[in-house]
Amino acid sequence: MRTPARYKRFTNWRSLATAATAALMATLLTPVAAHSAPRESAPVYSYENAIRESVWVDTKLDGDSDGKTDRVAVDIVRPREPAQQGRKVPVIMDASPYYSCCGRGNESQLKTYDANGDVVQMPLYYDNYFVPRGYAFVGVDLAGTNRSDGCVDVGGRSDVQSAKAVVDWLNGRAKGYTSRTGTTKAKAGWTNGKTGMIGKSYDGTIANGVAATGVEGLETIVPIAAISSWYDYYFAKGAPLYDSGPEWLSDYVESPDARARCAAVQQKIVDGAPRTGDWTKFWTERDYVKDVRKVDASVFVIHGMQDLNVRPKHFGQWWDGLAENGVDRKIWLSQTGHVDPFDFRRAEWADTLHRWFDHELLGYDNGIDDEPMADIERAPDQWVTSDVWPPRATDTVSLRPAKGAQAGVGTLSLRTGSGTETFTDDPRQDETDWAAQIDQSTSAKAGFTTKPLTRDVRLSGSSKVTVTATPTTSSAHLSAVLVDLGPDTIRDYSASGEGISTLTDRTCWGPSTTGDSSCFKVTRAKTANVDYTVFSRGWADLGNHASDAKGEPLTPGKRYTITLDLHASDHVVPAGHRLALIIAGTDEGLIDPPSSTPTLALDLARTKASVPLVGGAAAFARATSGSSYVTPDATLDGIGEPRATHRVPGGTH
């Protein structure tokens, strides 16, 4: 997303081309014609009479080793009238492994078909809403799922090529057929090739992966709660986030016939993703961040800042890479967990997505590129904007822990501390246990708090915590969390809806047919009153101290230093609250425990939190002046225990 004109903006071929086109149009159009140029696509085409068809696109891969290249099923809904008039339309595409196994959206919708095999129900509202407005909607079954050939390889070459091949077909560079096994070719003469990819979780992940190939014709992507590097879905610097690997996921989403023929691919996944947490070529292939320089499409990122399925590190590192490479971009950050914006900000989302696609795919000058880059949910259903994100005044500040009056109850300031604090890993405790007892001396954590703030402090971006620790055993896992200490009302991201409640009433978003309703259940924010909020977290295996790529056994009694990458966030700690850093061992429910139960001694002089503060160190100094440290001896109330509730990116509530 280009930043407002008053800021220096990145310039690339897209903005140059847009400027050139605008200049040409200005010279050719009369004032009346220029004034009447469309700013919004209108629902003028019939959805009921739309063309519904299926095509199988050749991926040029043979993932299942049957001697034939794999074809992926492509279900299409497109307006009939432009086709009759010889006018070409752009495409909105959602490539997914979930269309037959698991469903899409809050209501877990599946594709359904008529007797001819053409799609009847296309999950979600995109086809109902956008086809009448002059777009085609395309739902792609990834290789190894539903009606496609091949095997699921969990974000690898086959998954990405499944969708990239369709973009190529839409632009006349790949072969398509009217059936899965036949020889009758199908061409996409009805489209101008301009494609936008969208999807939540696994679907949005594929959009990231295809964009990272730089494929021509992909104009924009809208990744919602999407993975940017598959290693970071399963591990955090060697620490396992789940008790199973990607082989479980591929088996879960594959069609029954693919499951029967893809044993060799399954074994490659097992071999390539060892439970040691070591980085392998398998993970390199599935790291889209390394190829972010190839991204030519604009990117509209949406992510929940409390997403404990696809954790916010994914959008943070992807966003930073996009910024470094001058990609046009926009972002929404909610207080929810793994939730689609259709279910936490429905009307605004439909309008914004409509204008985004109109701008990126139809070329309408509707002003969305001059609006603030970021929308951030500051409190349930209360949103603020930021012209750029993170704000330009953001600077990384080193906050230092120091000893306090009680063991494990220390201070956090700009001054370097000294001495040690000791804790023992308790795999039965999690971040809510630690935060609830932040002002009490407990054996399982070391906590450090600022003075009560006299001014608001805003953290915006990704934090890091560098820990120097001496373990008593040969293995140790570390957790670090940032906590806002003070009363608040937040979305209850630990509840089953991850911050939303689903009601019985419905709202409709476009026309419906007998087999495809545009009406979806209404949702509302599910909130909790809390005494603290954990707003950023990170983990690591101390055995990875020397290398992010490979761990090693620890020597008991030896001092090690490691840096934990905390999740990206945008959070305001208000005046009167305190900011806390907690360092502990296993964060139960969010990482697996180590093979032993270590006690760790923190070297406070060599431990720090590097946090992105708007206004930098000066803002922090002002906010912590004029008050004194407090240590109330009380147990604080928070949400329920956090859990990595799914091993499936995009799992339903």
Region spans (language model):
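Secretory targeting and sorting signals
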Residues: 2-36
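C-terminal, loop-rich substrate-recognition/catalytic regions characterized by aromatic stacking residues
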Residues: 38-41, 346-653
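N-terminal cap/lid segment of alpha/beta-hydrolase-fold proteins
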Residues: 41-87, 453
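Accessory cap/linker subdomain of secreted extracellular hydrolases
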Residues: 42, 61-63, 67-70, 103-104, ...
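Short beta-strand element of the alpha/beta-hydrolase
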Residues: 87-97
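Catalytic nucleophile-loop/oxyanion-hole region of alpha/beta-hydrolase
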Residues: 146-165, 174-177, 341-349
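Short beta-strand/loop motif that positions the catalytic acidic residue
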Residues: 295, 301-303, 307
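Conserved alpha/beta-hydrolase "acid-adjacent" motif
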Residues: 308-314
